[in-house]
């Protein structure tokens, strides 16, 4: 799961206007360089070195860049101690969930229209949703997740609309026959209306049609019940530390 997450966040943020990445054994840093913690991530797993971890944390702190440190279970509690010593705050236990290959059909609110994003208008619509769902500045979202992302063979972004208005968005990253699910969001004023279920089940059904056989995601508390309903099961729980403010907790 650690390696899949590394590959996925690199794909997810790779089209950001100010994208920057660095890697060491057991460590992957992927930065949009936007002032939004949820768009800058350091992933920590087995084999990571304490000194390299500290150096990567300091490289972000020295620039006053908000970011998340996502520590997988294979990394010892010593990494948590280093994060705390450097002033990061513990945000949450963050479960990663997997859904293996079982049949799936679109469900949820049938009045929601789902499209696979392809044009600038769709990028703007997705940004509107993420701005509402996660309190992110829209200009930061558009720079971090631009329309050029749609041209990547490793990514699809799906947008949900009702009456022409954007109400949901989700990003899928592809890794062989495995798919990562990221930036799943519903407009804050339209939650609990079956939009998220319709959006995600439709996107996943299309991915299965295209040959995907396994899905994984990191589950926020707000989305956990939806993911369980769709057959996801927790396979490990990471520890998330933050410098700045996160809306993943």
Regions found by a protein language model. Give the residues of each.
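N-terminal charged segments
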Residues: 1-64, 75-76
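A short helix-loop-beta-strand connector motif used in the catalytic cores of GNAT acetyltransferases and
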Residues: 15-17, 65-66, 91-94, 149-159, ...
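A conserved beta-turn-beta hairpin within the catalytic core of GNAT-like acetyltransferases
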Residues: 35-41, 91, 174-182, 191
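Acyl-donor-binding surface of acyltransferase catalytic domains
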Residues: 46-121, 241-243
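Conserved acetyl-CoA-binding loop-helix of GNAT-fold acetyltransferases
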Residues: 50-57, 186-188, 192-205, 209, ...
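Conserved GNAT acetyl-CoA-binding A-motif
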Residues: 63-73, 207-219
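Conserved active-site alpha-helix within GNAT-family acetyltransferase domains
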Residues: 76-90, 197, 221-237, 244
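A conserved beta-strand-loop-helix scaffold within acyl/acetyltransferase catalytic domains
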Residues: 138-189
